């Protein structure tokens, strides 16, 4: 049973969403199903084994990581073309089979980046190459640098120096409405701006 819960909605997820069940053998799987039936009466999706169950979680999380990298890279080009990426995505998601993802300052949290690197390391150990995932990780890791560049450009346009300037960071968690800051890209941005001499103030509503 791979852990699969959305931070901030853990109780709802455990009591409402279908759960994957896959043990090291059939007997273990039956025991796990009985425990779930006793604690959480939700739909159980039986997998052939625990390896397959974990592969489902890895696939869904890496899918998101890759697609966030895709739209983030698109946004860098659209920015130069004077195109509002959010307008593009809002229109695109009206198409029934388009799964919208949004660009940002990077990807953080305890799952997406780690799961991508987990798959990359596994593939490397097997002599395989997951080039799309590897490229996506590089894109997402670089996005904080773009935010810093945008900030520096804005100061330059205003004929101001970042050094000794006060900058307010609104939100440092890796996603809205949670207190978790694991691997948040905001930390890279904050550290770099502090290195440049900025006075950083943080507020996360």
Which functions belong to the PLM regions below?
Residues 1-205:
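Structural/interface elements that position substrates and couple domains in central-metabolism enzymes
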């Amino acid at each position: 049973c791979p852990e699969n819960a959305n931070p901030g909605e853990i109780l709802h997820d455990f009591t409402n969403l279908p759960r994957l069940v896959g043990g090291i053998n059939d007997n273990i799987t039956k025991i796990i199903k009985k425990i779930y039936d006793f604690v959480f009466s939700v739909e159980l999706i039986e997998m052939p084994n625990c390896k397959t169950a974990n592969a489902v979680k890895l696939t869904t999380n890496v899918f998101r990581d890759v697609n966030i990298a895709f739209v983030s890279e698109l946004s860098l080009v659209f920015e130069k073309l004077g195109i509002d990426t959010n307008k593009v995505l809002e229109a695109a998601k009206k198409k029934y089979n388009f799964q919208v993802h949004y660009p940002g300052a990077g990807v953080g949290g305890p799952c997406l980046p780690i799961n991508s690197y987990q798959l990359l390391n596994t593939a490397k150990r097997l002599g395989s190459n997951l080039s799309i995932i590897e490229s996506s990780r590089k894109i997402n890791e670089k996005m904080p640098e773009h935010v810093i560049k945008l900030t520096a450009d804005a100061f330059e346009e205003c004929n101001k120096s970042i050094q000794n300037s006060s900058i307010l960071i609104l939100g440092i968690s890796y996603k809205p409405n949670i207190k978790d800051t694991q691997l948040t890209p905001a930390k890279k941005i904050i550290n770099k701006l502090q290195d440049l001499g900025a006075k950083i103030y943080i507020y996360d509503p």
